[in-house]
Swiss-Prot record:
Lineage: Eukaryota, Metazoa, Chordata, Craniata, Vertebrata
Name assigned to this protein: 2-oxoglutarate dehydrogenase complex component E1
Modified residues (N6-succinyllysine): K74, K564
Source organism of the structure: Homo sapiens (Human)
Molecular function as annotated in GO: heat shock protein binding; metal ion binding; oxoglutarate dehydrogenase (NAD+) activity; oxoglutarate dehydrogenase (succinyl-transferring) activity; protein-folding chaperone binding; thiamine pyrophosphate binding
An example Gene Ontology CC term for this record: mitochondrial matrix
Gene expressing this chain: OGDH
Amino acid sequence: MFHLRTCAAKLRPLTASQTVKTFSQNRPAAARTFQQIRCYSAPVAAEPFLSGTSSNYVEEMYCAWLENPKSVHKSWDIFFRNTNAGAPPGTAYQSPLPLSRGSLAAVAHAQSLVEAQPNVDKLVEDHLAVQSLIRAYQIRGHHVAQLDPLGILDADLDSSVPADIISSTDKLGFYGLDESDLDKVFHLPTTTFIGGQESALPLREIIRRLEMAYCQHIGVEFMFINDLEQCQWIRQKFETPGIMQFTNEEKRTLLARLVRSTRFEEFLQRKWSSEKRFGLEGCEVLIPALKTIIDKSSENGVDYVIMGMPHRGRLNVLANVIRKELEQIFCQFDSKLEAADEGSGDVKYHLGMYHRRINRVTDRNITLSLVANPSHLEAADPVVMGKTKAEQFYCGDTEGKKVMSILLHGDAAFAGQGIVYETFHLSDLPSYTTHGTVHVVVNNQIGFTTDPRMARSSPYPTDVARVVNAPIFHVNSDDPEAVMYVCKVAAEWRSTFHKDVVVDLVCYRRNGHNEMDEPMFTQPLMYKQIRKQKPVLQKYAELLVSQGVVNQPEYEEEISKYDKICEEAFARSKDEKILHIKHWLDSPWPGFFTLDGQPRSMSCPSTGLTEDILTHIGNVASSVPVENFTIHGGLSRILKTRGEMVKNRTVDWALAEYMAFGSLLKEGIHIRLSGQDVERGTFSHRHHVLHDQNVDKRTCIPMNHLWPNQAPYTVCNSSLSEYGVLGFELGFAMASPNALVLWEAQFGDFHNTAQCIIDQFICPGQAKWVRQNGIVLLLPHGMEGMGPEHSSARPERFLQMCNDDPDVLPDLKEANFDINQLYDCNWVVVNCSTPGNFFHVLRRQILLPFRKPLIIFTPKSLLRHPEARSSFDEMLPGTHFQRVIPEDGPAAQNPENVKRLLFCTGKVYYDLTRERKARDMVGQVAITRIEQLSPFPFDLLLKEVQKYPNAELAWCQEEHKNQGYYDYVKPRLRTTISRAKPVWYAGRDPAAAPATGNKKTHLTELQRLLDTAFDLDVFKNFS
């Protein structure tokens, strides 16, 4: 079978799916119609099936051959035997022997028999017509399904019924059939399951069953999937007669869940009628839908579900799916309660949650996590995916059988936000796949006030999912049983095929965008219909009462019981005196903090290493730890250079990174480095993945060969996405504090396409959601004449969002001042000028007793700069990250003679030292490097200023004046010295673009800033 699958894969073009016998009904084969015998005279290479144009037919023939080799022509029998033996398709096929003269006579006789049977052609045409009819329903039946609960809109935005869908007998002529054929019995093809145990049905019954399967309250989009097995699986789930049956107990459970969903919203409306809560009215069926997905997934072995969703219905999901204590939810409506935790907090419909409980349907433990998110719709999608991937990684769930994700979407956002597309394209990448996500779209057919026809160009809001061959199940939300069935199928699909699936809940929004909004301004006719619409709970209760499943008193008792639960929780909420944001934590780290959520210490050990460890890592970094592995000649030279550096006890940038990573792996810290081209490195400096030059796709990661029991190292080239991938890595870093998760931009300039993740999650995440995160951003930065899009990581933006006060000098005598600063800041911003300091800051990120995002402006030209080297001595035990690197030359020996103290950061230091040496001013100008910009090293800089009492102060940067670090550094330096001296500026003039694209202009600007930095008279006119 494997060989045939391989063969079929080679032959299969991207055609519409046909059939696979694996799922076909057990029924007698249809009577074969007579075919004209072919005289085989074409060469093997000309056989059309070898070109891949008939791959579906080949697979059907193969399935028939498996059941009975004699049921296919001898040539097929030989072909399949050869293929199973391992022969390639071209040699496996052997043409049948040419026909003899006697055989040709037999052909002529057979032809005369055909001519004597004029009805044969009609029979064949009728059967082909029926097959086309069935296929038309499978492909386009969803277009005429009754999906809108209001009955006024077409879910696909098309009011015309497709001409090739049979919904009335007058359209039979399209297929060459007529009304007289309705009672004629037709054999059913293997591509349908409408027959159940029957192999033939009258045309009238075929149409009726197809209408029931595809044109009622469920619309199924799946025929674009180019996998026969998957298509056949879906057909079986929706076409089999009587398959959508529920027991009375299941119906009562569904009713009870609808009661909870509906009465929760009504309770909030009664108690807080003027509060925004973004209620679920109009799609109350979402709660039982989610619970059904979770129930079925739990039954299939899932024990951890990570969810992401927008504001619509969030409180209801927290209450009735995740089972957050109701009193904690009600407390969020009390404006008098103050928050006990540090930080700004967030509105109630953004908060996340983590809860472990027993699933009552399966009686198994299940953990539910709802990720906190901002109002930026769909921004949490990749975050959820990353967290899911991490949880799967840490529990060894390589197939996604234990941990899964559910993403909820609004219809307008699902179609309108590009991050949805980016996230979908991560779904099947080896280093990013979560083995299938269940997407649930709350399709209330409106986006705030915008009509769907103005919100998307595609027929459905879900069409983006087609790019990854995810089946899409549209369902009318006013048919709760149809919704439950679709959700069961979605969970089963994900469990079976480990691929994404979409459930489109076509519903409506009973109120405005929020409870204070008036929708009649913009959608008057729609809301007139909504005002007349019975709630789904009332409809379903009436149905069950009429069926005798429940009686009216039982239904009313269920309502009273839940109302009582809400009232009792409301009473308890009045006893609460304070709000605890940490009760809403979506990603707890058990054992990392104390029980009250505080760090276990406020100190950081030395980040240095013994020389033996440094040497061992360096030796592995400069070798190929796999036998018979041929690397590129240019890479051999790079590894040789690394080996020489190790012998000389020095490191460059790439080797320093290698040593930081390797040492953390030894300590059991998982490291994940992701981004565009990170395996080699944009600047061809890293080479963490070696490629065999003689064996295709054979690779080696030396970092995973360092120690016997080391943690795994994951380095992965990402898709060409910043927004999606950075969100994914942020989510991965949320799962555990004991991992170093890094995202590297190809150039720092490109991080701004991920600005939403930076602004809404990384920068304020802890303040809003009491959630620490240790993600590291590596942003290549430096003005090197490469133009405005390859020069600046926009440090001014990161620094502007730092939360320290530039006008307040902190208590510099405080114990562990530097660690306390790190604990209080919202993120750490550094620009290292030496490989050794880069090594230390990476290790410090893990050795700190808490986690903060780390922004590193990394170099480009310094990667190979001969002066950008560090000695092993700077990395040995007892050494630390240097927040400030002071002047250590002649100027430091005679500080009273220093006329100017230049402060700078990053690469420009090397330009300054070169110019200072050329001007012979090493005794007159001192240069101090600020390596850690935020939190600002007030204490160390005060010492530097005091050391040079006669020096004027200047900040020098290569960036333009309105960019870079100047506006951040100047007020803090002034505060440090109590505004005793001015802080002058030496750098480029203000500009709109980050850099010039002209090399000559670049060099002119550089020389001008160097002239300013070393002209001791330049600032006298401004005094």
